[in-house]
């Protein structure tokens, strides 16, 4: 035990000079007031709640064409209310620093209709949300909120949201410019990756080598060479997922998943608190990669 926290199962294999960090170093909720909350009625599905950020309300010109970044949360996160903005990895994209790096961007955070059944199990997640329903929401948002104008269409997903990100790309490759799945072991087959290349879809594939929910050696390693062969695929597979304090990340909500929650450092633009990049190939972080598309 350490800091009254369970010792992670991987604690005995971390470097000798490393330390375990039991929580992210950032404050949750600081930018929630920059988001609006609305609901969308699909043609043949229950209403979906979503949050959004409009850059033209925060100093950017109204007549400019902007990218849209949509964030798909992980399992059970929709049950957390406004906190899902943060858990999905979208909150800090409303920060002035991030928006400046992107030249302004609309942000969209849809919520799956999650609930707990009588046994306490989470139901209604992305696995029970048809891809056409999510497409309908995003397409409608572009038309209603962005005047039908968009420079880039980017989809980011965490955990089960990363699975849904791939699922959306597999069905609507022509609709997206970039996919950023974080913590997904279900890498599409060669035929689908060929389609991504044909449709000029850029891929940022991110997963930790000690992800507790996805066996890296079994699920990821056999697909790495194929990912490297894509036209535009950035692969980020850190040996250890770290928090802003440079400690190795541990999160335990009944089971250890700190190494699965790569979304937290991704949310921090892959920057440590002292301003140094977590990934030397990305001196300007994730926002720099997005801005370069």
Regions found by a protein language model. Name each.
Residues 62-64, 79-85, 119-123, 167-168, ...:
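Short, solvent-exposed loop/turn and secondary-structure capping segments
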Residues 68, 72-134:
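Active-site machinery of serine-nucleophile hydrolases
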Residues 204-206, 210-213, 218, 226-293:
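C-terminal catalytic histidine-bearing segment of alpha/beta-hydrolase fold enzymes
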Residues 150-197:
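Primarily recognizes the serine-hydrolase "nucleophile elbow" in alpha/beta-hydrolase
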């Amino acid at each position: 035990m350490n800091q009254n926290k369970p010792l992670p199962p991987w604690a005995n294999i971390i470097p000798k000079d490393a330390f375990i960090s039991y929580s992210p170093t950032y404050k949750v909720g600081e930018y929630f007031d920059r988001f609006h909350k609305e609901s969308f009625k699909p043609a043949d599905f229950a209403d979906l709640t979503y949050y959004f950020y409009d850059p033209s309300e925060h100093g950017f010109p109204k007549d400019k064409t902007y990218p849209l970044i949509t964030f798909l949360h992980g399992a059970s996160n929709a049950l957390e209310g406004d906190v899902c903005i943060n858990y999905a990895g979208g909150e800090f994209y409303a920060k002035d620093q991030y928006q400046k790096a992107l030249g302004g961007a609309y942000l969209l955070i849809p919520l799956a209709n999650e609930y707990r059944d009588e046994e306490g199990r989470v139901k209604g997640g992305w696995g029970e949300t048809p891809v056409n329903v999510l497409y309908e929401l995003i397409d409608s948002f572009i038309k209603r909120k962005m005047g039908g104008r968009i420079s880039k269409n980017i989809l980011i997903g965490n955990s089960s949201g990363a699975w849904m990100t791939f699922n959306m790309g597999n069905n609507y490759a022509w609709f997206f410019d970039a996919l950023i799945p974080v913590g997904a072991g279900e890498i599409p087959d060669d035929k689908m990756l060929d389609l991504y290349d044909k449709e000029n879809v850029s891929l940022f594939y991110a997963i930790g080598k000690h992800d507790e929910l996805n066996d890296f050696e079994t699920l990821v390693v056999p697909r790495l060479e194929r990912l490297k062969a894509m036209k535009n695929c950035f692969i980020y597979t850190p040996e250890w997922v770290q928090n802003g304090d440079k400690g190795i990340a541990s999160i335990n909500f009944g089971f250890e998943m700190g190494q699965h929650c790569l979304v937290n450092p991704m949310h921090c633009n892959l920057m440590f608190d002292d301003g140094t990049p977590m990934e030397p190939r990305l001196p300007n972080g994730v926002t720099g990669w997005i801005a370069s598309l």
